[in-house]
Regions:
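Flexible loop/hinge segments that line or gate small-molecule binding clefts
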Residues: 100, 104-145, 156, 163, ...
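Hydrophobic alpha-helical
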Residues: 96-111, 183, 196-197, 201-262
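C-terminal motif of bacterial Sec signal peptides marking the signal peptidase cleavage site
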Residues: 15-18
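Short, solvent-exposed amphipathic alpha-helices that sit
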Residues: 44-58, 146-150, 174-193, 207, ...
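Hydrophobic alpha-helical segments within soluble ligand-binding/sensing domains
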Residues: 28, 33, 77, 137-164, ...
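Short, well-structured alpha-helical segments in soluble
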Residues: 74-90, 209-221
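Extracytoplasmic "Venus flytrap"
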Residues: 32-51, 55, 59, 64-82, ...
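Hinge/cleft segment of the Venus flytrap/periplasmic-binding protein
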Residues: 20, 29, 167, 171, ...
Length: 313
């Protein structure tokens, strides 16, 4: 009998401990806000989720975070959105895996009268108009200006003479396309800066390594790289190291994730364009909550950017 009482006592203690382990800031009730990311594996989106979670705790709402495993899995992201619409979330925050491909899923959110906050990658305006899709607000960086910052830095750092390889994002992504547009605008002023190869590496580090390795073999004269995100840039850094050319090829990335900042400090990357994904996540959730409350919100909300170099750290 004594053993039975001891067992019951232990169970009670474990149950109490389990109850206490619950995050005290997590609301037991309140509107459910969905945040759909492109991937859980990119530090950029990890930071975005962190900012969103902080805002959700502070505002007393329940945050549901979901994403496909890979950024290129547009179909999976569409399925996630459709499922969230079925469960009647109060609002949807989404970083689209495809600016055009996500439009049919957003149409279902519109039909269910679920407010939509787009984060990071803008929805293609023409595709949305053709489908009769509307969104309530956009939260993100000025990617064209970020591309210009990268291009201006390359022109200055190279003295106006460079053989450049460009690692693009997924074709059709507004984010990557905007960064490329800004970059090309900036380097046009320097006729000595020549893009000798430009290919997609689909935002991924492994592909950044493979694609740039092939570029370097085809164009050994390459002395500079602009990658539309840091994951691809870090892949290029690894390919440069494998070729024994560390320190001889300048690499400029975009996002200023921790690994990129470490590479800049070590001298294996030259620069990166800093975004503030935590701020994006925070502002997206705050905007979604305002929409749920029936408040008016700005249609376009831009977060800050900046150039990170070894000198600026």
């Amino acid at each position: 009998m004594q053993h039975g009482r001891s067992f019951i006592g232990i169970c009670v203690l474990l149950l109490a401990a389990a109850c206490q382990s619950r995050d005290p800031a997590e609301p037991r009730a309140g509107p459910r806000i969905a945040l759909v990311l492109k991937t859980p594996n990119n530090p950029f989106f990890i930071d975005m989720q962190r900012g969103a979670e902080e805002a959700a705790r502070r505002l007393g709402v329940r945050l549901v975070v979901q994403s496909p495993e890979r950024e290129i899995d547009v179909e999976k992201q569409m399925q996630i959105v459709e499922n969230l619409v079925q469960t009647r979330v109060a609002a949807l925050c989404i970083a689209p895996a495809s600016s055009k491909g996500i439009v049919p899923a957003l149409a279902k959110a519109n039909a269910a009268r679920i407010p939509i906050v787009v984060v990071d990658d803008e929805v293609d305006a023409a595709a949305a108009a053709d489908a009769g899709v509307s969104t309530d607000s956009y939260v993100g960086s000025d990617n064209v200006e970020g591309g210009r910052l990268a291009g201006r830095h390359l022109v200055m750092a190279s003295g106006g003479r460079a053989k450049v390889a460009v690692l693009e994002g997924i074709p059709g992504h507004e984010t990557g396309d905007s960064r490329l547009r800004g970059f090309h605008e900036a380097i046009e002023v320097a006729p000595g800066v020549e893009v000798v190869s430009s290919q997609t590496a689909n935002w991924e580090r492994d592909q950044g390594f493979t694609v740039f390795q092939n570029m370097l073999q085809a164009h050994p004269e390459i002395d500079s790289v602009f990658a539309c995100n840091d994951m691809m840039a870090l892949g290029a850094v690894e390919a440069i190291a494998a070729a024994g050319r560390t320190g001889k090829i300048r690499v400029i990335g975009f996002d200023a994730v921790d690994d990129a900042r470490k590479a800049i400090e070590a001298g294996s990357m030259d620069a990166s364009i800093a975004q503030f994904p935590s701020e994006m996540g925070r502002l997206a959730v705050e905007t979604a909550v305002r929409l749920v409350r029936g408040e008016k919100v700005p249609k376009d909300q831009r977060t800050k950017i900046g150039l990170v170099t070894r000198a600026s750290r």
